[in-house]
């Protein structure tokens, strides 16, 4: 399959020789590695009740999966409720799938298996609207699938959803690298605006999103998946860059994601939130603006105007 979106992919691309170097020449571990690696996200059990109430709120399910209600509609991002083949889940999903209220809208940022989990998708509400970047529609196999290019928008009820750029890449199989698009989403609703970055490296797209999309109330940003840095820098931000992205976006609140659910990279499991909190304190940002939620923890979405 042709690499249709090769020119948009993050550079430099990492290939088999880079992976071999990563796996055969690991970097030395810090003295506190074991202590940080033993940490796991906290767990709460109020998420299903909060989502069913109809009030605007967000619940971290785990990894890049959030369930949030805005404009009366239940939105799920990058749904994965189970494990990845060969990679067990470290914490259970924040809301059991059987307890999740009917879903209205599913946003998938790209085709990597930890973001587009087809077994989960096939168990979600069949009548939901699925929004995906260009080329990903045929994989979803649902009736209501909408493909978007960067900066294109689609309206579902009172919500306006725009696909925005990210610095990443796509590959479902070795022969279809960059054959489908990737991105993040800006969701505008009556109560405020949510941004979900998907996977992304650092870049000037954060400032461009702020300029073109206006105020963002809740920025869902990845904070894990960054080590070793020489390998991951072109594709994943680290906790410090997540803080910089928050500032570049001009967002009001940062909702952490993409950590503590799977062991996919080399940093200790509990290191990402520790580093982000340290960066936050160093830059004297208001502590209440940083949301490192427990899995299953509901948080009200109430925008300040």
Positions of the model-derived regions?
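Cap/insert and terminal regions of metallo-dependent hydrolase folds
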Residues: 1-11, 105, 111, 129-131, ...
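Metallo-beta-lactamase
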Residues: 1-85, 93-99, 129-196, 217-224, 275-297, 301-303, ...
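Short beta->alpha connector loops
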Residues: 62-64, 112-114, 136, 167-168, ...
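A generic local structural motif
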Residues: 63, 90-96, 116-119, 180-184, ...
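Catalytic core of the metallo-beta-lactamase
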Residues: 67-69, 155-217, 233-240
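Acidic/histidine-rich helix-loop elements
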Residues: 79-94, 170-175, 227-236
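Active-site metal-binding motif and surrounding structural segment of the metallo-beta-lactamase
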Residues: 85-132, 214-220
